[in-house]
From Swiss-Prot:
Family: Belongs to the ribose 5-phosphate isomerase family.
GO annotation, biological process: D-ribose metabolic process; pentose-phosphate shunt, non-oxidative branch
Name of the protein: Ribose-5-phosphate isomerase A
Keyword annotations of the record: Isomerase
CDD domains: RPI_A
Keyword Isomerase: yes
Pfam families in the record: Rib_5-P_isom_A (PF06026)
Active site: 103 (proton acceptor)
InterPro entries attached to this UniProt entry: NagB/RpiA_transferase-like, Ribose5P_isomerase_typA_subgr, Ribose5P_isomerase_type_A
Assembly, per entry: Homodimer.
Length: 217
């Protein structure tokens, strides 16, 4: 089974967590694209979706799924999204697709966060994948200096502008043993919008696509 086939298996497995008659929170990325494909098969059973990115919104609309503004709804029963890394505590690094801020907001609203991944995303210690930090453009160098004081090596992801009009610093060289503490520490730097650590709002269920099928954790 290829990596993409494992992603597809995880994406389709998430369908069983979708509650008919509700609005579904939808994340961003290659694995989520498979979930959107699956969600389209039951689009007449849901009331629509809230999306974490322009790209996912466009894909949902292509299937005729109504996309709501998060400000227009009171609650989400479920949010389905991928991860770049996840550990045994279900802490995650997300944001490889630069949608981390909107992903974190939608995840905060949802009653349940379903993380869909292939088996290459599970790690013992977070940090091999660069940690994305969304930053107000004028604060780029200041934030980079502050991150270096914490032991990280930030690199500007040149040419990338988030859906919110900000930039991304990818932080390398950090073995993240206390994800909750670092999440707060980074968010406390003036100019940081948010960072890609999802520790305070981690996953409730993890669906892992493997060569032998989907494992639920």
């Amino acid at each position: 089974m290829t990596q993409d086939e494992m992603k597809k298996a995880a994406g389709w497995a998430a369908l069983k967590y979708v509650v008919p008659g509700t609005i579904v929170g939808v994340g961003t990325g290659s694995t989520v694209n498979h979930f959107i494909d699956a969600l389209a098969t039951m689009k007449d059973q849901i009331n629509g979706a809230v999306s974490s990115s322009i790209a996912s919104t466009e894909r949902l609309k292509e299937f005729g799924i109504n996309v709501y503004d998060l400000n227009d709804i009171d609650a989400l029963s479920v949010y389905v999204d991928g991860a770049d890394e996840i550990n045994a505590s279900r802490d995650m690094i997300k944001g490889g697709g630069a949608a981390l801020t909107r992903e974190k907001i939608v995840a905060a609203v949802a009653d349940k966060f379903i993380c869909i991944i292939d088996n290459t995303k599970t790690v013992d210690v977070l940090g091999q994948f660069p940690l994305p930090v969304e930053v107000i453009p004028m604060a780029r160098e200041y934030v980079a200096r502050e991150i270096r004081k914490l032991g990280g090596n930030p690199e500007w992801r040149e040419g990338v502008v988030t859906d919110n009009g900000n930039i991304i610093l990818d932080v390398k060289g950090m073995a993240i043993k206390d994800a909750k503490a670092l999440e707060v520490q980074l968010n406390g730097i003036v100019g940081v919008v948010t960072n890609g650590l999802f520790a305070h709002r981690g996953a409730d269920v993890v669906l892992i696509g493997t060569p032998d099928g989907v494992i639920t954790q």
